[in-house]
Amino acid sequence: MKKLLLEAPILTRSGYGEHSRLVFRALKLKEGIELFINPLEWGSTGWISEETDERKEIELGIGRFGALMDQANQTKQDPGFDYQVHVGIPNEFKKKAKHSVCVTAGIETDRVSSDWLMKTHQGLDKLIVPSQHAKDGFTSTSYEVHNTQTDQRVTLICNSPVDVVPYPVKEVTPAPLDFTIDTTSYPSPF
């Protein structure tokens, strides 16, 4: 069984919290992985408090993560994650597995920061974004940087493949409303 670390603001009431739960729902269907969850904060947003079956599944993953990290700390060994999925902004990413993916919404402009591009040179194996616009922000941005140790100028570009995976759309069939409104009891304003 492969160990997969999901680092995400999965319990927050935020856009990234909802995105994290979408990723969780997809990952839990994948056979052959053991899911460990590190619940991250997202600013000062509150956390979901409802006790649902999904919440219980998330709590199990959080418990597995805590137990594994306790064991790793006691034995002074690496927890040995095979895969890491980090949901959030790229500058928060730190590589913790053999294969690492960052799922991010990107940014609503035509370029990303140099800090985000630097992360693609620091062990980020793939970026997943929800739109072509977000992908273009990563793949079209470049910066000229000066390496003060070598005195060379180089161009900083995205060094990871970027895949577009749009948000799913839930089809809802509205239930018919069965009610009548009696408007005869209201005086006419005319």
For the regions a language model picked out, list residue spans one by one:
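N-terminal subdomain of nucleotide-sugar transferases
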Residues: 1-44
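Nucleotide donor/acceptor-binding cores
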Residues: 2, 98, 190
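Conserved donor-binding/catalytic core segment of Leloir-type glycosyltransferases
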Residues: 5, 184-190
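Extended catalytic core of nucleotide-activated donor transferases of GT-like folds
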Residues: 5-7, 46-137
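Short, glycine/charged-enriched secondary-structure capping and boundary segments
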Residues: 19-21, 98-100, 115-118, 141-144, ...
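Hydrophobic anchor at the start of a short beta-strand
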Residues: 33-35, 100, 162
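Hydrophobic residues at beta-strand termini and immediately following loops
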Residues: 38, 103, 165
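Donor nucleotide-sugar binding/catalytic pocket of nucleotide-sugar-dependent glycosyltransferases
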Residues: 125-186
